[in-house]
């Protein structure tokens, strides 16, 4: 096994992470400290504060409105993160921000605030890839060594394996992301956006009794989700469909919103399990790490766990404080890069809406 090029810190290091690529605004402070016994570096989450922009049922979130929310809340969220961590801005060794991918205007809010704080307090800046942040926080929390990563969120669906200091994308969505698919269907059937559309679909799917037929779109290690979204939406116009207020126990041959939530989950998650298993077979991996907001879904974890156990492996996942977009994952990835000497001059801190996971040089791993 190759030795990591990342040296143990000689003193405690602190990083502030700012995340705002979509409707979650998060700020967190993390510390990396030398172990008194000479063991692995001690990593401690000092604060992890988040504020979510929530729209009315049936509505998504527009970039301009989301950016307005972030501008309104970013100072309050940073102040709370600093207060909870019990540190001062001058104590920070670096400020990390989400460089991309994500929605342009919300990303710019986080980058602008990071630049301002950097200039005010003379603190180095580190731009972080959003997906790499998810992966590094997932690895840290779960202590998983070298798993296949399934990254599932509102804007991304990727199957990833690490090789030669890159997170290589083995498969991905060919059209829309799984989180986008779930969110859009939730809007069609009138589910609330609080706490999230995907969570509400998961809750209602547990009451589903009927698995309706939906297209199954896998190709190699890629998936296509636009067709399945169109098909499940079409069921809401079927004469057998009954909306929430029309569902009763008398009629038998009906299709309910519960059935459609159940069917959409079962079919799309089966597709995700299939492409993940294919990637595992390709690289000889046994373990899976699920990251991203959809990774909180317990049914997805259960289905993936069945597959992994049959292969003699395990599934790793985190709770909602870490799988949903947050600032601490940006702080973690940023501090790893900082420890390798990777910082950004001010003129290089522009945001990149389409920032590929495999574009990042993962210098801190062997």
UniProtKB/Swiss-Prot annotation:
Q: Keyword tRNA processing: yes or no?
A: yes
Q: Which GO terms describe its molecular function?
A: chromatin DNA binding; metal ion binding; N(6)-L-threonylcarbamoyladenine synthase activity; nucleotidase activity
Q: One of this protein's Pfam families, by short name?
A: TsaD
Q: Which domain of life is it from?
A: Eukaryota
Q: Keyword set for this entry? A: Activator, Acyltransferase, Cytoplasm, Metal-binding, Nucleus, Transcription, Transcription regulation, Transferase, tRNA processing
Tell where it localizes: Cytoplasm; Nucleus
Query: Which biological process, per GO, is one annotated for this protein?
Result: telomere maintenance via recombination
Which free-text remark accompanies the cofactor? Binds 1 divalent metal cation per subunit.
**Which annotated residues bind a divalent metal cation?**
130, 134, 151, 325
Binding-site list for substrate? 151-155, 183, 198, 202, 297
Give me the reactions it catalyses.
L-threonylcarbamoyladenylate + adenosine(37) in tRNA = N(6)-L-threonylcarbamoyladenosine(37) in tRNA + AMP + H(+)
- Which InterPro entries does the annotation name? ATPase_NBD, Gcp-like_dom, KAE1/TsaD, Kae1_archaea_euk, Peptidase_M22_CS
EC number, as in UniProt: 2.3.1.234
The cellular component terms of Gene Ontology attached to this UniProt record, alphabetical and capped at eight, are: chromatin; cytoplasm; EKC/KEOPS complex; nucleus
Cofactors needed by this protein, per the record, are: a divalent metal cation
Q: What class of enzyme is it?
A: transferase
**Self-association and partners:** Component of the EKC/KEOPS complex composed of at least BUD32, CGI121, GON7, KAE1 and PCC1; the whole complex dimerizes.
Report the family membership.
Answer: Belongs to the KAE1 / TsaD family.
Query: Which NCBIfam families does its entry note?
Result: arch_KAE1, gcp_kae1
According to its UniProt entry, the function of this protein is described as:
Component of the EKC/KEOPS complex that is required for the formation of a threonylcarbamoyl group on adenosine at position 37 (t(6)A37) in tRNAs that read codons beginning with adenine. The complex is probably involved in the transfer of the threonylcarbamoyl moiety of threonylcarbamoyl-AMP (TC-AMP) to the N6 group of A37. KAE1 likely plays a direct catalytic role in this reaction, but requires other protein(s) of the complex to fulfill this activity. The EKC/KEOPS complex also promotes both telomere uncapping and telomere elongation.
Among HAMAP family, the record links this protein to:
Kae1
Q: What is this protein called in UniProt?
A: tRNA N6-adenosine threonylcarbamoyltransferase
Identify the gene encoding this protein.
KAE1
């Amino acid at each position: 096994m190759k030795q990591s090029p990342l040296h143990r810190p000689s003193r405690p290091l602190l990083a502030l992470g700012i995340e705002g690529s979509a409707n979650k605004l998060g700020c967190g402070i993390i510390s990396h400290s030398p172990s008194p016994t000479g063991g692995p570096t001690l990593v401690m989450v000092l604060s992890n504060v988040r504020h979510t922009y929530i729209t009315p049922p049936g509505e998504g979130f527009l970039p301009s409105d989301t950016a307005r929310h972030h501008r309104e809340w970013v100072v309050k969220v940073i102040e709370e993160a600093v207060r909870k961590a019990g540190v001062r801005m001058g104590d920070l060794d670096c400020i990390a921000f989400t460089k991309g991918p994500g929605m342009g205007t919300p990303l710019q809010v986080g980058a602008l605030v990071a630049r301002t704080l950097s200039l005010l307090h003379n603190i180095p800046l580190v731009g972080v890839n959003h997906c790499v942040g998810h992966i590094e926080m997932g690895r840290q929390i779960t202590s998983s060594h070298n798993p296949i990563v399934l990254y599932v969120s509102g804007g991304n669906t990727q199957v990833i394996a690490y090789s030669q200091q890159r997170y290589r994308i083995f498969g991905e969505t060919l059209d829309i992301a799984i989180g986008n698919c779930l969110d859009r269907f939730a809007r069609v059937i009138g589910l609330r956006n609080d706490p999230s559309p995907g969570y509400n679909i998961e809750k209602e799917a547990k009451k589903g009794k009927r698995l309706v037929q939906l297209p199954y779109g896998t190709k190699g290690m890629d998936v296509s989700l636009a067709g399945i979204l169109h098909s499940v939406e079409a069921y809401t116009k079927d004469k057998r469909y009954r909306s929430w207020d029309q569902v009763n126990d008398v009629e038998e041959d009906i299709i309910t919103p519960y059935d459609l939530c159940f069917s959409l989950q079962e079919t799309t998650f089966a597709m995700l399990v299939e492409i993940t298993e294919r990637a595992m077979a390709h690289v000889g991996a046994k373990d899976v790490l699920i990251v991203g907001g959809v990774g909180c879904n317990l049914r997805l974890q259960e289905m993936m766990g069945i597959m992994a156990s049959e292969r003699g492996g395990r599934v790793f996942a985190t709770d909602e404080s870490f799988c949903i977009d947050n600032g601490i994952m940006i702080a973690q990835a940023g501090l790893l890069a900082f420890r390798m000497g990777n910082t950004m001059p001010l003129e290089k801190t522009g945001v990149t809406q389409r920032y590929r996971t495999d574009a990042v040089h993962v210098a801190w791993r062997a």
